[in-house]
Amino acid sequence: MISESQGGLMSAFTTPPKFSGFIRRLVEEGYVNAQNMQQALEKAKKFKQDIVPYLIDNFSISPLTIAEIISLEFGEPLLDLGVFDPALFLKDKIDEKLIQKYRIMPLVHRGHVLYVATSNPTNIEAMDAIRFNSKLKVEPIIVEHDKLERLLSEHFVEETHFNFDTEELDLDVEVDPHTTDDDDEDDKLKDEAPIVKYINKLLIDAIRMSASDLHFEPYEKSYRVRYRVDGVLRLIATPPLQLATRLASRLKVMSQMDISEKRVPQDGRIKLKMSKSKTIDFRVNSLPTLFGEKIVLRILDPASAMLGIDALGYEPEQKALFMEALNKPQGMLLITGPTGSGKTVSLYTGLNILNTEHANISTAEDPVEINLEGVNQVNVNPKVGLTFAAALRSFLRQDPDIIMVGEIRDLETAEIAIKAAQTGHLVMSTLHTNNAAETLTRLRNMGVASFNIATSVNLVIAQRLARRLCSQCKRPIQVPERSLLEMGFTPEDLAQPEFQIFEPVGCHDCREGYKGRVGIYEVMKITPEISKIIMEDGNALEIAATAETLGFNNLRRSGLKKVMQGVTSLQEINRVTSE
């Protein structure tokens, strides 16, 4: 029998938490469940972080979604920062330290009222601090968090990493950028605060620009730094050539490489703490080139693996096929595409969906890119005999439910993976092929028996990443009907009343007309018809033709659908898919 006091105690633990304001709306509309929201509020408070960026960083909620919900809750319009002249921002009305601490921007001063842009008008501490500092009444104006952050990064210099100039360095020192002598550079770096600041600035700038890679490149008479943003390399900086060795050495120290070894490539890793609750990893590789060491960093943001399937760009029917394959107790799910096409994010998204307390998940990766809590991840190391095949054999003795292999590269790995898929395990992996049909014939060319391919593979996904048109500046264009038909549009497409194509323009928000990327997918289920072709040793063309008759869109068709939806441009689809 439970006493009254015990009952009260139990109800205290079982009563769902009560939320208010935009937090309540986010929970009610299903963006975050009540338990996760309560934990988010507690962690944000513990880390002294605003709840809005915390939710954006740790859940699949876009800045626009949160801004719209806050706008709805307050009954105030959502402001587009692009309508303001940046030269007129009232940066002198508030102490710069407060602007950086609370991430706000003073916009308009009228009488005794100061209007400030903020992504969270419920931050009472921030409003009070600004009111006290400015001696004015403060009225919040709701804006999107990412746009506000971009604006702040452009207009303010953060003390920790943005007040560096190459003029601070002693460039008169005789430094041979092509030297290979073993210097005591580790000791020198301790005193090179400007170099440290410069590297930190470049790393953080890359994250804020949503870059995927950073390239530090020495040449005979110049040095350059480039970022890959939305799949395209952009020139960012041209530091003096005299800094080449010092920049490379600093990056190698940060990634725990041997700075005295300049003759062979090296791999390393950097962890950059952005806040108390967010850390970004960089995978680093050095390459000895003719004029010094080229360093390339790949940004590994854990948040990219937590986006959720809806953020990847699947069409509804493609998403349904993906989820169906994930929910099967056994079989193989293969993802294919070139390097940089988003295969890893797709795999991790699937693993996150499957990652429950009831599943034993093991992965073999080269290397592990993002740490997933609750998943047993293994870095393959062929030098010591830990190959993909060796890891797979070990997994089968570990009572697995789900196995992920980073890439199927050889017959041994393929055969073990297929054996696992046929004996009660769900296996996920990738290959480098051009489309879904070629993936099946590639396995056969490796030496896998056609019967085993037909009976073990459940689904093949081919994918590309296309740049997403900026919603602020894209504009409609007229293209001759004949040209559209030649590009792959159908007469039925052109007959739709809402048919419209857009092109990039470029604005303050995006600069080049594109902002972000979207996935283009070919999702092919292995049906009885396709299985029959595989077992009869049919070629990729036959498989692709049958898939088309069954209603599976190829990459080109999926891309054209994104064009008709106004998500991307014809130029982008022509770039990432074939006719």
Swiss-Prot record:
It is found in: Cytoplasm. GO terms for biological process: pilus assembly. GO terms for molecular function: ATP binding; ATP hydrolysis activity; metal ion binding. Signal peptide: none annotated. SUPFAM superfamilies: EspE N-terminal domain-like, P-loop containing nucleoside triphosphate hydrolases. ATP binds at G340, S341, G342, K343, T344, V345. Inhibited by the inhibitory protein CpiA. Gene3D superfamilies: 3.30.450.90, P-loop containing nucleotide triphosphate hydrolases (3.40.50.300), Type II secretion system, protein E, N-terminal domain (3.30.300.160). It holds the Pfam family T2SSE. Zn(2+) binds at C470, C473, C507, C510. GO terms for cellular component: cytoplasm; plasma membrane. Disruption phenotype: Disruption of the gene reduces transformation rates by two orders of magnitude. Natural transformation is undetectable in the pilB-tfpB double mutant. The pilB-tfpB-pilT triple mutant produces no detectable T4P fibers. Keywords: ATP-binding, Cytoplasm, Fimbrium biogenesis, Metal-binding, Nucleotide-binding, Zinc. InterPro entries: ATPase_typ4_pilus-assembl_PilB, P-loop_NTPase, T2SS/T4SS_dom, T2SS_E_N_sf, T2SS_GspE_N. It comes from the Bacteria. Its main location: cytoplasm. Belongs to the GSP E family. Interacts with CpiA. Both PilB and TfpB are essential for optimal T4P production, with each motor playing a distinct role in T4P extension. Overexpression of pilB does not restore the transformation defect of a tfpB mutant. ATPase component of the type IV pilus (T4P). Acts as a molecular motor to provide the energy that is required for biogenesis of the pilus and the extrusion of substrates generated in the cytoplasm. PilB is required for optimal T4P extension and, consequently, efficient natural transformation. May promote processive T4P extension. This is Type IV pilus assembly ATPase PilB. It comes from Acinetobacter baylyi (strain ATCC 33305 / BD413 / ADP1).
